[in-house]
Structure formats: C-alpha cells, structure tokens
C-alpha cells in the first residue's frame, strides 16, 4: 500500500512538517512502475502501491493518452489472476476510474461477470458496481437478470451494491431500471438498514415524476413497515414533499400525513427525531399549534451531552426564530446556557437566536457575552451574528448606541470581505432607518475607510457619505476623511472621493470655496477619470456647464438616480455614429424589459417584422417600432411614441395563421400592430386586414387602418389599426378581432397563384388595453433617495382589502401586474412563511410622469390579505389615478 508519511525536522523553524507520500511523483515514472502488473509472480503489495499512485494521478486531474490508458487497462486486467482480496478491490477501483471504451469493456466483462457470480460476496458486490459504471445499454440488457437477482439477495452488501448501481443507471437507462420495480419494492421490506435505505431512494426516483404514485408510496410506508433510521429520514422528506404539494391544491383543513411526522418525534433514533422536527418547522404556513411538539423535542436536545445534537437543535430553532420568534421563547433559558458552550458554532447560533427572540432589557447583557467569543468563530458565523444585531437594532431603535458601538468595534478587527461588507451594510441600514444614529454611524464609517483594504467598500461608503454627510449638523468634519482618500488611495477610490466632495460643495454653500480648492488640486492627478471628474464638477458648481444652469439642475445631476437601464444605454452607444452632433441621452429607452421565458425558447418560426427585434437586444425594440410607425403617413402626426408592449398572441400554436399584436401607446392615440404569418404552403393571402370591434371600448374611436396587400407562405407581414382617445384619459377596454383576407390557391409545383380568390375570415382572440399599458417599467438605483426627493405633498396613502389569496406572493404578483411597474431592490420576491411584506415599485406614467409606489402587505386572517398603498409622483393627480387603478383592479 502507500508508503508511510515522511517526517522531516526543519532546523531553522524547529518544527515538524508532514509531507504527502505522493509528493513529487511523475506520471511517466508511475507508468514505468506499472510494468510490475506483468510479472509472472505478482507482488500484491507492490501492485496495490502502484494502483494507489495511478488513482492519485487521475484524481489530481492528470490525463492519460489513449495509448497510455489502454496499456494500463490491459495490464490491470491481468491482475484478476491474483487471489489477493485487497488487490482485487484496487483492481475494481482502477477499472472504474479508467472508464474503458466499448471495445475494452468486452475484454473485462467476462472477468467481472465471473466475479458477479462468485461465492465471495465482496467480489460480487464490487463487480456489480464496476460493471454498471462501464457498460452501455446493450450490455446492460444481458446482465439485467443478474442485477434483479442481486437486488433481492440475502446478503445486504450485494443487495445494496445492486440498488446503488440502479440509482446510477436510472440516469442513463431509465427504461431498464423502471422494470425492476417489483424487486425494489421487495427490497424496501428488507430487515437490513442500508438495503431498505437504498431501496426506498431508488423506488422514489423511479416514481418521482408521478405525484399520485409518490403519494401512494408514502401512504403505504407511513403505516410502519420502515424500520431503518436512514430510510425513515428519507420517508420524512418524501412525506414533507407530499404535504407541500397537497397544501398548494387544498383550501385548508388538516394536513395529510402530519400525524406521521408528529409520531416520528417519538422515535428511538435521534436522527429521525431531528429530521421530523426540521420537516415540521419548514412546512408552509405552519401554525403555532403544529410547531409546539417539534419545539419541545428540540428544547430537550439543547441539553444533550452530544455536541452534534445541540448544534442541530439550535440551528433549527435559529431558523424558526426568524419567522415565529414567540414559539421559541420557551427555549431561551436553555439557549442562554449554550452561550458558554465550548463549541463556538453552537454558542454563535444560540446567541443569534436569543437576539431574535429576546426583549429590550436583555440586549446589553447579550452584547457583553457576545464580545467574548467573536474572535473565536469563523467569518460565516460572524455574518450571522451581524445580521441578527441589525434586526435587533431595528426592532429596538433606542438601543442603537450599544449595538452601533459593537458593530464599529468588530469592524476594526481582522476579517474577510463578506464579513466586513455585512457590517458596513448593517451600519448603513441603521443610519437610514434610525435618524438619531446618523452622526455616530457616519463617524464610524469615516474611521473605517482610513484603513480599508477593499476598494468596493471604500467607494460604497464614499457614495453614501456624499448623500448623507451634507445633511448633518457639521458637514465640514467629514471633508478631511474624504480628501485623505484623494491623496492616499487607488484611482477608483480617488474618483469616488472627487464625486463625494462635489456633493458637499453643491449642498453646503459655506464649504464651496474649500471644495473648489480641493477639486483644483485634483486637476493634476495622474488618472484620467479623476481629472475629468474634477474638471466637470468645477464647471458644474461654478455654473459654467449647461447642465448646471440652476441649483436644482446641479443637485439633480449629482444626486438624481440614474434611471436609464445600463443595457439600454450600452446598446444606444454602440449604435451611435460619431458626428458633430452630440449623443442625445433622451433617445435612450427608459423601459426595463425582461424577456419572457417562452420567448427565450426557440420556436422555429421566423421573426415577424419589427417584432423580430424581440429576439435581439431588447433595448432596440422601441427605436425599431418608432422608426417604422413614423414612416407610415397615417401615423406620422401622432407625436412621440410612449410605449410599445410585448407581443400578445391572438392565435393558438400550430394553427393555419399565426397572429400576434403589439400595442403602441401615444398621448392621444393607440396603434395596434398585427403581425401575421401564413403557415399554409398552398395558399396566398391578399388584402389582409383585421376588423376590430371596439363596442366594449367606447373611449376609443377608430381613425385609420392600413391593410397588408399580400401575405405569402411563411413570409411575415403587418397590418395596422389606429384609435384616437382623449389625451390625459386612462382609456381601457376590450377589442374583438377578425382577420379578413382574400385567399388564392397556389400550385406547389410552380408556385403560381390562381387569378381568382375567395374572401374568407378567421376569428382571433380578444385583446384588452389595461391601465398597465400606460406605465413604463423604469427602475431606480436607490428607491429611498428617489422617494425622499419627491414632493411629500404628492403622496397619497390608502388601505385596501384584497380578499382571500393563496399566499402573499400571489397578492404581490397580482398588484404588480395591475400597475405594470418595475419592482425595485428585489422586493417582488416574498420569503416563504412571511406574514407581512413590503414591495417597492417605480415607473413612468404616460406624459413622462415619474411614479414611486410603496406597497405594504399583511395577512389579516387565515388567507385574507390587507394592503397599504403609498404613492408619490411628479403630479398629485397621477398619484390619485394610481389609487383609482388599484381600487378598480
């Protein structure tokens, strides 16, 4: 086997260093050593050592050439003549790792088949594993009979080997493995723990795509036939899956199989108890009554003598405390004793759980205990502590001083990027949400950037300092920290510091002369970006730049959120041809468009006119449509195009004619662009037009129609219908559509169409114009700043009952769909089991009116959802309209 470790004494360091037995081995030398496989008198120990080295090389990523692999493979097959059991097991490993080709497999198959029928169970089990890894589907059918017998073999080692091989083969030959269901079901009843475990895993994988079959499997096994603790843990997971799926389809009542999960809490095996407790705590919408038995057993484990049980219990309780803190309060006394646990991971989880469940009076005591062990735990656990402190501070804002001091102290200690970022993010959130914490928080951040090794965090703090520092009682005290960055840091941080100085100069008149002096010094910086920024800001603050004609313009330029999606700007800049005319940033589309999943899949159809832009870069869509519509005389006088919708399908897939419609919204008009495709080779369509019935849309009046002269097979074309509406009116309605045309037969052999045609029509799906069509999805980079910059007088607040909903997520999605706005900062995602949620939306209403919405959702009953809607906009009337849209939605 492998040589023993070599221990060498280092005279200089006077300490022992341990070297790997494989240190310095080379592939060529090992391949030479492999010649021992050909010796007439095999040395089993020597052969095992060589195979170990070969396996090491393979697992380290060394590759063998085709010739080398073939030579090693054939040499290895000669070792089957040895009777040494240890060497035989190494041979199995070597063959499996070499992954021989189909031709080579045939050579070794006979030896493996012989071992598979051997009287030695260890040979049989290993031969099955190797065979199933190297054979193809053709050879599999030849040994299928042996594998089915092995599954029900009396020896558990052989049976487990066959079942594990079945799990592997299910990925490559699922149809073959599915024929083994009867044998696998028999193995599930085995008394051997591992056999039952592997059999249950394989049986579930065979049936996993059939929900009814999985439900029946769980029903039959929860009656008590499973004795293996490992298999019981699997069964608990499958039961949880069935409960989740059934809960989605039921409207209430008792959960199926919950009694089984509860009974597992009384199992003899600790792993089963923990698995059941974890499963109960992770159920969707779990109630306090359902949690109680799980919390009780977890509380018992907190005082266990086994560290792994204490860790598992406190980690589960930590997760529960995030959603059901009151349910965990009974465990607080037990968890306080764990703060001094020798295992720092357990102590960390205990104290963070207490932070989530504790009251205001216990904060100072917990802070003192936490200080003692922060240096002893890994960064990942430190991040957990920081997040818990942030939540606690927001929960008890009066305790911000002690919590902020704790954060600033650990910020000065050693730590990685993610850990430091978590602390900085927490301090920034506390400054934003607790006004009294602003001064001390900004001071701590300034001290941190004096010795910060992370460029990202330095620029983040400088940006935040530029927004919040000028609003403090003494802004001048921050200038020294900012200018130090210009002198001492790299180019990226220096550029950020220049921008921060300009923000102070724009908002604090008394500091402007000093800022001018500092910015002029930056004109001699060695970096282009720093010099350019300094030049721009000097002209801007001095009133020389065109953007800085008024103080409001300057502040908007410096502090306004960058509302243009970067991907749109990038595309426009790529299309911009350098000329004497400057680049017009107003030409860049503001709308944030996400491509639907269906559009990402290849449909096999040709793109339809300008709609083909959807398959390319998304931001060019509006420009393409605007160019097309302005070239049509009937629509040229409609003004600037506000928005173009995504295509709405009006026909089923695979029908004779494919039609979708794009809604183009103007201030006083709506143009419907019907993209048509003829999918019948034997037909030519002429004079194609869509007849639109607007009887259910009385706020619209048809003003123009543009027909399509000819629509050959598989050659997309467009027809248009334009409607007029009152400017400033949120006109909505439903339109019914009929495709009318003259159809002419086409000779397939010549491609010639008949002279005579027949008038025909084709019924299309109805189309709706909704309130969301008048809203552009435009994101903001910083919602809080954008909200505060809007006039509070424009704010309108009201509360609404949304009725019974399946979940908060469904309610959030429905309101976003009604408004057609862009979710900000990922707030469209609702955490599972949440009973409240805040969603932030932004957009531009027709007329280029910026709108911001803050939605607060809460569950007022079992499934009753209440919502508070706050709107701010550039026009108070639009704020009122947003409320009307929601009220009527």
From Swiss-Prot:
GO terms for biological process: endoplasmic reticulum to Golgi vesicle-mediated transport; intra-Golgi vesicle-mediated transport; intracellular protein transport; protein secretion. GO terms for molecular function: structural molecule activity. Its main location: cytoplasm. GO terms for cellular component: COPI vesicle coat; endoplasmic reticulum; endoplasmic reticulum-Golgi intermediate compartment; Golgi membrane. Residues 596-617 are annotated as: Disordered. Keywords: Cytoplasm, Cytoplasmic vesicle, ER-Golgi transport, Golgi apparatus, Membrane, Protein transport, Repeat, Transport. It is a peripheral membrane protein. InterPro entries: ARM-like (IPR011989), ARM-type_fold (IPR016024), Clathrin/coatomer_adapt-like_N (IPR002553), Clathrin_app_Ig-like_sf (IPR013041), Coatomer/calthrin_app_sub_C (IPR009028), Coatomer_g_Cpla (IPR032154), Coatomer_gsu (IPR017106), Coatomer_gsu_app_Ig-like_dom (IPR013040). It is found in: Cytoplasm; Golgi apparatus membrane; Cytoplasmic vesicle, COPI-coated vesicle membrane. HEAT repeats lie at residues 67-102, 103-140, 289-326, 328-360, 361-398. The coatomer is a cytosolic protein complex that binds to dilysine motifs and reversibly associates with Golgi non-clathrin-coated vesicles, which further mediate biosynthetic protein transport from the ER, via the Golgi up to the trans Golgi network. Coatomer complex is required for budding from Golgi membranes, and is essential for the retrograde Golgi-to-ER transport of dilysine-tagged proteins. Oligomeric complex that consists of at least the alpha, beta, beta', gamma, delta, epsilon and zeta subunits. Belongs to the COPG family. This is Coatomer subunit gamma-2.
């Amino acid at each position: 086997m492998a040589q023993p470790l070599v221990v060498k004494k280092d005279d200089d360091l006077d300490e022992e260093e341990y070297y790997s037995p494989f240190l310095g081995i080379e592939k060529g030398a090992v391949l030479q050593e492999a010649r021992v496989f050909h010796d007439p008198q095999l040395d089993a120990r020597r052969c095992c050592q060589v195979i170990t080295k070969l396996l090491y090389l393979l697992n380290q990523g060394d590759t063998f050439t085709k010739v080398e692999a073939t030579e090693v493979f054939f040499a290895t097959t000669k070792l089957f003549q040895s009777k040494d059991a240890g060497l035989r097991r190494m041979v199995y490993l070597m063959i499996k790792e070499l992954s021989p080709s189909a031709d080579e497999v045939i050579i070794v198959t006979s030896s493996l088949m012989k071992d598979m029928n051997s009287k030695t169970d260890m040979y049989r089990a290993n031969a099955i594993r190797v065979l199933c890894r190297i054979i193809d589907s053709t050879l599999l059918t030849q040994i299928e009979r042996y594998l089915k017998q092995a599954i029900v073999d009396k020896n558990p080692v052989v049976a487990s080997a066959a079942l594990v091989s079945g799990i592997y083969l299910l990925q490559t030959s699922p149809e073959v493995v599915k024929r083994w269901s009867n044998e696998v079901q028999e193995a599930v009843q085995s008394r051997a723990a591992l056999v039952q475990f592997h059999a249950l895993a394989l049986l579930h994988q065979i049936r996993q795509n059939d929900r009814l079959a999985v439900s029946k499997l769980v029903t039959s096994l929860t009656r008590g036939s499973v004795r293996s603790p490992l298999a019981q843990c699997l069964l608990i997971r499958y039961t949880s899956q069935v409960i989740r799926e059934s809960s989605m389809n039921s409207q209430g009542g008792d959960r199926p199989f919950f009694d089984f999960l509860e009974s597992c809490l009384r199992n003899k095996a600790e792993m089963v108890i923990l698995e059941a407790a974890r499963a109960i705590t992770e159920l969707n919408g779990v109630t306090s009554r359902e949690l109680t038995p799980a919390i009780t057993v977890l509380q018992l484990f907190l005082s266990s003598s086994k560290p792994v049980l204490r860790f598992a219990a406190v980690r589960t309780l930590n997760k529960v405390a995030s959603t059901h803190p009151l349910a965990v309060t009974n465990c607080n006394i037990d968890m306080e004793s764990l703060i001094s646990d020798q295992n720092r991971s357990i102590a960390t989880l205990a104290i963070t759980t207490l932070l989530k469940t504790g009251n205001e009076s216990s904060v100072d005591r917990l802070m003192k205990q936490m200080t003692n062990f922060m240096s002893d735990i890994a960064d990942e656990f430190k991040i957990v502590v920081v997040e818990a402190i942030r939540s606690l501070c927001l929960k008890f804002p009066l305790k911000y001083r002690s919590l902020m001091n704790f954060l600033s102290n650990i910020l000065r200690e050693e730590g990685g990027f993610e850990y430091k970022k978590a602390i900085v993010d927490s301090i920034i959130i506390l400054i934003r949400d607790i006004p009294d914490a602003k001064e001390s928080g900004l001071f701590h951040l300034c001290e941190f950037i004096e010795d910060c090794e992370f460029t990202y965090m330095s620029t983040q703090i400088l940006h935040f300092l530029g927004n919040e520092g000028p609003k403090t009682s003494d802004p001048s005290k921050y200038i020294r920290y900012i200018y130090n960055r210009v002198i001492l840091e790299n180019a990226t941080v220096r550029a950020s510091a220049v921008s921060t100085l300009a923000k102070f100069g724009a908002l604090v008149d008394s500091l402007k002369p000093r800022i001018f002096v500092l910015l002029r010094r930056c004109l001699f910086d060695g970096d282009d970006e720093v010099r350019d920024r300094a030049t721009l800001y000097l002209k801007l603050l001095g009133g020389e730049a065109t953007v800085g004609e008024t103080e409001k313009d300057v502040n908007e330029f410096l502090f306004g959120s960058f509302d243009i999606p970067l991907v749109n700007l990038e595309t426009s800049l790529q299309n911009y041809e350098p000329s004497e005319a400057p680049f017009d940033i107003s030409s860049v589309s503001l709308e944030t468009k996400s491509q639907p999943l269906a559009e990402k899949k290849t449909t096999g159809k040709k793109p339809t006119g300008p709609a083909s832009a959807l398959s390319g870069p998304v931001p060019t869509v509006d420009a393409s449509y605007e160019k097309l519509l302005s070239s049509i005389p009937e629509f040229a006088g409609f003004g600037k195009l506000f928005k173009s919708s995504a295509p709405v399908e009006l026909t089923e897939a695979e029908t004779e004619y494919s039609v979708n419609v794009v809604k183009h919204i103007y201030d006083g008009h709506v143009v419907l662009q019907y993209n048509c495709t003829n999918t019948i080779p034997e037909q030519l369509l002429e004079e194609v037009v869509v007849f639109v019935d607007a009887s259910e849309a009385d706020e619209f009046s048809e003003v123009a129609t543009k027909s399509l002269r000819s629509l050959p097979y598989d050659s997309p074309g467009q027809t248009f219908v334009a409607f007029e509406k009152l400017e400033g009116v949120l006109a909505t309605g439903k339109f019914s559509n009929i495709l009318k045309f003259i159809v002419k037969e086409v000779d397939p052999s010549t491609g010639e169409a008949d002279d005579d045609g027949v008038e025909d029509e084709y019924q299309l799906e109805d189309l709706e114009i909704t309130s969301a069509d008048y809203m552009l999805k435009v994101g903001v980079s910083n919602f809080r700043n954008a909200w505060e910059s809007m006039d509070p007088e424009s704010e309108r607040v009201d509360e609404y009952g949304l009725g019974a909903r399946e979940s908060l997520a469904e309610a959030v999605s429905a309101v976003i769909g009604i408004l057609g706005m862009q979710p900000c900062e990922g707030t469209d995602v609702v955490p599972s089991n949440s009973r409240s949620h805040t969603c932030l939306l932004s957009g531009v209403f027709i007329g280029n009116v910026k709108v911001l919405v803050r939605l607060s959702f809460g569950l007022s009953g079992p499934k009753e959802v209440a919502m508070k809607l706050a709107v701010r906009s550039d026009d108070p009337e639009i704020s009122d309209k947003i409320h009307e849209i929601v009220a009527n939605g």
